[in-house]
Swiss-Prot record:
Function: Involved in storage lipid mobilization during the growth of higher plant seedling.
Involved pathway(s): Carbohydrate metabolism; glyoxylate cycle; (S)-malate from isocitrate: step 1/2
Catalytic activity: D-threo-isocitrate = glyoxylate + succinate
Residues engaged in binding Mg(2+): 157
Stated name of the protein: Isocitrate lyase 2
Organism of this sequence: Glycine max (Soybean)
Source superkingdom: Eukaryota
Catalytic site positions: 195 (proton acceptor)
GO CC terms in record: glyoxysome
One Gene Ontology term from the biological process aspect of the record: glyoxylate cycle
Binding-site residues for substrate, renumbered to this chain: 86-88, 196-197, 232, 419-423, 454
Length: 557
C-alpha cells in the first residue's frame, strides 16, 4: 500500500500534471518485482524535461541532429543541448544484423537501443575523462578551461513500437536500460512502416496508436522513470489507413461517389487482372483507370456537392450548407453513421458513397491526409504524450502555424517537435537564406521546442569523407594537413590530439594508481608522438628561423 501511495504521489507531481493514464497506481505496482532498480537514463530524462520546459517558457528550441558515433556526440556536446538517434541512420549504417537498408523499420528491434547504449557509454566515458583531467588542474587552470557538458539527453527513434503491445513494452524497456532520455513513436502501421518522407505510408487507427502510447507510459511507470514520450503523426501526407474502426478517422476516409462502379471494387478488379495474367504496368494501368472513374471524396465533400445540386433556392441552400458545416466541423469528429443521418435530414437521400470499393489489395482504406487530420490526431495523442510531432512534406511556416494553433486550441501547454528534414530540398522551398536562418527561432515561438535534422550526422559525415577523399587522392598529405589537421587546430577540435581525446591519459591514471603513482608502460609517457602538438604555432608552414615562423609539428631530427 505504501508503494501504491508513492506512485500516486509521483503522478500528482508537476511533471505529470497533463498526463492521462487509463490504469491505476495499483496496476503499476502489481507489475513490478521486489528488487527496486534505478536507471541512469532517468536522470537524463528529468534533465531533458526541464530543458524542454525552459525552452517552452522562453519561446526557444533545442536544436540537434542525428548522431552516428562517439566522435559526433562529443563534438555536438560543445554546442547542442540534446542528441538525436535516428532509426533511418541506424537502418542504413548500423543494424545489429549488420545488414544495411532503407528506413523500413525491418531491422532487428534492438538496433536503435544498441546505438543509444553505444553513444550513452561514450557520453559517460568522456564525462569521466574530463573530470579526471580537471582534477589534475589548479583552480586557475580550471577557471581558464571551458567545461563541456557531455551528458546531453538522448532522444531516440522508436519507429512504430515494433509490433503489438508486448513488443512496444519490451522496446521501451530496452531504451530505458540503454540510456534514452526520450523516445518517439509514430502512428504508421508496423507492417508497412516507411520513412516519413517516402510514399505508401499507412496509418493505424487513432485508438491503436493511443494503445502504443499507453503501453510505453505503462512500461516507464513500472520502471519508475520519467522518460519523455514523443507522439509522431504522419497524417499530413499519408494516403492510406489500416482500419475504419475509430470514428475520429471517418471524416478523412475517402469513398467512391460514381454509382456506375457500384459492386465493382478495385480489389476484385485487380484480382481478376492478375488471374488473366496481367502484371506490372498493366495492373497499374487498371488501377489508374478505375481510380480516375471513382470520383473519390470524403463523406463531407459528397454531402456538400449533393446539397449544391438540390433544386432549391439559394438562401435555403446556404442554410443547409451552413448547418452541415456546423455539424461536420472537424473538431466534432462526425462518424459515418451520424453524417448520413444528418445528411438525410437536410434532404440528401440515397447518397451513393462507398468507402469499401476503393480499398487496396491489402485491404487498406483511402485516406485524405492534411494538417487538419494531423491536428485531430494531435488532440487525441496529447493526453498520453509529452511532445507532439507532425511529419511534413516540406518546411512550411504556414503549416507549422496551423498545426500549432490547432493542437494548442485544446491543449495550450502542449510541447511540439519538428523534423528539419534533409529529405526537403531546402533550396527549392522558396525561402531566402535569411528565412532559412530564422526558420528554427520562428517556429520555436509557435511552441516547437525540439527541432532536429534526423539524418544530419550521416550527411555531414558523407560530405567531409567525399571531399577529403577526392582531395587526398590528388594532393596527398597536403590535403590532410590543410583540410583536417590545420582546421582542427584553428577550430579547437580536440581530436587533433586523438590519443588524449580517446582517453590515453585517463587510463594512464589507472596504471599509475594501481602501481603506486609510477608506470613505465604509461601510454602517454616519453616517446608518444602527440608531444609534437604541445607547442603553440604562430602559423602553419615550413620553418624559417629568420622570419620567426614555427613548424606545424616538431621535427624528429
Amino acid at each position: 500500500e505504501a508503494e501504491v501511495a508513492e506512485v500516486q504521489a509521483w503522478w500528482n507531481s508537476e511533471r505529470f500534471r497533463l498526463t492521462k493514464r487509463p490504469y491505476t497506481a495499483r496496476d503499476v505496482v502489481s507489475l513490478r518485482g521486489n528488487l527496486r532498480q534505478t536507471y541512469a537514463s532517468n536522470e537524463m530524462a528529468k534533465k531533458l524535461w526541464c530543458l524542454l520546459k525552459n525552452h517552452q517558457a522562453n519561446g526557444t528550441a533545442s536544436r540537434t541532429f542525428g548522431a552516428l558515433d562517439p566522435v559526433q556526440v562529443t563534438q555536438m556536446a560543445k554546442h547542442l543541448d540534446t542528441i538525436y538517434v535516428s532509426g533511418w541512420q541506424c537502418s542504413a549504417t548500423h543494424t545489429t544484423s549488420n545488414e544495411p537498408g532503407p528506413d523500413l523499420a525491418d531491422y532487428p528491434y534492438d538496433t536503435v537501443p544498441n546505438k543509444v547504449e553505444h553513444l550513452f557509454f561514450a557520453q559517460q566515458y568522456h564525462d569521466r575523462k574530463q573530470r579526471e583531467e580537471r582534477m589534475r588542474m589548479s583552480r586557475e587552470e580550471r577557471a581558464r578551461t571551458p567545461y563541456v557538458d557531455y551528458l546531453r539527453p538522448i532522444i531516440a527513434d522508436g519507429d512504430t513500437g515494433f509490433g503489438g503491445t508486448t513488443a512496444t513494452v519490451k522496446l521501451c524497456k530496452l531504451f530505458v536500460e540503454r540510456g534514452a532520455a526520450g523516445i518517439h513513436i509514430e502512428d504508421q502501421s508496423s507492417v508497412t512502416k516507411k520513412c516519413g518522407h517516402m510514399a505508401g505510408k499507412v496509418l493505424v487507427a487513432i485508438s491503436e496508436h493511443i494503445n502504443r502510447l499507453v503501453a510505453a507510459r505503462l512500461q516507464f511507470d513500472v520502471m519508475g522513470v520519467e522518460t519523455v514520450l514523443v507522439a509522431r503523426t504522419d497524417a499530413e501526407a499519408a494516403n492510406l489507413i489500416q482500419s475504419n474502426i475509430d470514428t475520429r478517422d471517418h471524416q478523412f476516409i475517402l469513398g467512391v461517389t460514381n454509382p456506375n462502379l457500384k459492386g465493382k471494387s478495385l480489389a476484385t478488379l485487380m484480382q481478376q487482372g492478375m488471374a488473366a495474367g496481367k502484371s506490372g504496368a498493366e495492373l497499374q494501368a487498371l488501377e489508374d483507370e478505375w481510380l480516375s472513374k471513382a470520383q473519390l471524396k470524403t463523406l463531407s465533400e459528397a454531402v456538400v456537392e449533393a446539397i449544391e445540386r438540390q433544386n432549391i433556392g439559394e438562401e435555403e441552400k446556404r442554410r443547409k450548407l451552413n448547418e452541415w458545416m456546423h455539424h461536420s466541423s472537424y473538431e466534432r469528429c462526425l462518424s459515418n453513421e451520424e453524417g448520413r443521418e444528418i445528411a438525410e435530414k437536410l434532404g440528401v437521400r440515397n447518397l451513393f458513397w462507398d468507402w469499401d470499393l476503393p480499398r487496396t489489395r491489402e485491404g487498406f482504406y483511402r485516406f485524405k491526409g492534411s494538417v487538419i487530420a494531423s491536428v485531430v490526431r494531435g488532440w487525441a495523442f496529447s493526453p498520453h504524450a509529452d511532445v507532439i510531432w507532425m511529419e511534413t512534406a516540406s518546411p512550411n511556416v504556414i503549416e507549422c502555424t496551423q498545426f500549432s494553433e490547432g493542437v494548442r486550441s485544446k491543449h495550450p501547454q502542449m510541447m511540439l517537435g519538428y523534423n528539419l528534414s534533409p529529405s526537403f530540398n531546402w533550396d527549392a522551398s522558396g525561402m531566402s537564406d535569411e528565412q532559412m536562418r530564422d526558420f528554427i527561432p520562428k517556429i520555436a515561438k509557435l511552441g516547437y521546442v525540439w527541432q532536429f535534422i534526423t539524418v544530419g550526422g550521416l550527411h555531414s559525415n558523407a560530405l567531409i569523407t567525399s571531399t577529403f577523399a577526392r582531395d587526398f587522392a590528388n594532393r596527398g598529405m597536403l590535403a590532410y594537413v590543410e583540410r583536417i589537421q590545420r582546421e582542427e587546430r584553428n577550430n579547437g577540435v580536440d581530436t587533433l590530439a586523438h590519443q588524449k581525446w580517446a582517453g590515453a591519459n585517463y587510463y594512464d591514471r589507472y596504471l599509475k594508481t594501481v602501481q603506486g603513482g609510477v608506470a613505465s608502460t604509461a601510454a602517454m609517457g616519453k616517446g608518444v608522438t602527440e608531444e609534437q602538438f604541445k607547442e603553440s604555432w604562430t602559423r602553419p608552414g615550413a620553418v624559417e628561423i629568420d622570419r620567426g615562423s614555427i613548424v606545424v609539428a616538431k621535427a624528429r631530427m
